[in-house]
């Protein structure tokens, strides 16, 4: 009878020790820069900018774009694609892109939509397209590749910034 409380007490002590283990860096010791656990992104951002407001579906994004009079930026990507991952890292870490992105309705998709206007030159990733508040796909705002018009690479951040500004500027002159 006495063994059960003693066993429970020992189990609690072991569990408390495990949970309360000192994880702070001691003075003079090097901090391990590699975290053993991967950082989980916010559900809708999928790591593209956790502080930004993202929409869940294409239909919701179109509605918000029209009602808020903001352009829509759609990012097509895949979690397992190394090109998508590289672009995501640059997009999320670039302060200027993140600041400018606040002026858009944002949607990132890991699946294709039924709207064929969003894949005029094929279904490839990563692909970034813009839609204006009148729900017109901005086919004129393209990346630097002739065979993948809406593709961007990590080195294309200046072009992406220019295209984001173009989407905002043309929005103001058209309305």
From Swiss-Prot:
Signal sequence span is: 1-20
Q: What does this protein do?
A: Required for MUC2 post-transcriptional synthesis and secretion. May play a role in the production of mucus by intestinal cells. Proto-oncogene that may play a role in cell migration, cell differentiation and cell growth. Promotes cell adhesion.
Listed GO cellular component terms? endoplasmic reticulum; extracellular region; extracellular space
Q: Which domain of life is it from?
A: Eukaryota
Q: How does it assemble?
A: Monomer and homodimer. Interacts with LYPD3 and DAG1 (alphaDAG1). Interacts with MUC2; disulfide-linked.
Keywords, A to Z? Disease variant, Disulfide bond, Endoplasmic reticulum, Proto-oncogene, Secreted, Signal
> Does Disulfide bond show up as a keyword for this record?
yes
> Which organism is the protein's source?
Homo sapiens
Linked pathology is: Respiratory infections, recurrent, and failure to thrive with or without diarrhea: An autosomal recessive disorder characterized by neonatal onset of recurrent pulmonary infections, coughing, wheezy episodes, interstitial lung disease, and bronchiectasis. Episodes of vomiting and chronic diarrhea result in failure to thrive. Results of sweat chloride and pancreatic elastase tests are normal.
Bridged cysteine pairs (disulfide):
none
Q: Which GO terms describe its molecular function?
A: dystroglycan binding; epidermal growth factor receptor binding; identical protein binding
Q: What is the effect of changing residue 143 to E?
A: In RIFTD; uncertain significance
* Ranges for region Required to promote cell adhesion: 21-40
| One GO BP | positive regulation of cell-substrate adhesion
Q: In which tissues is it expressed?
A: Expressed strongly in trachea, lung, stomach, colon, prostate and small intestine. Expressed weakly in pituitary gland, salivary gland, mammary gland, bladder, appendix, ovary, fetal lung, uterus, pancreas, kidney, fetal kidney, testis, placenta, thyroid gland and in estrogen receptor (ER)-positive breast cancer cell lines.
Protein's gene: AGR2
Q: Which family does it belong to?
A: Belongs to the AGR family.
Q: What compartments host this protein?
A: Secreted; Endoplasmic reticulum
What happens on changing residue 60 to A? Monomer only, and reduced cell adhesion efficiency
Homodimer stabilization: where is this motif? 45-54, 60-67
Q: Name one Pfam family in it.
A: Thioredoxin_7
Instruction: Note the effect listed for residue 117 to Y.
Output: In RIFTD; decreased interaction with MUC2
Tell me the protein's name.
Answer: Anterior gradient protein 2 homolog
Q: What is the effect of changing residue 63 to A?
A: Disrupted dimerization
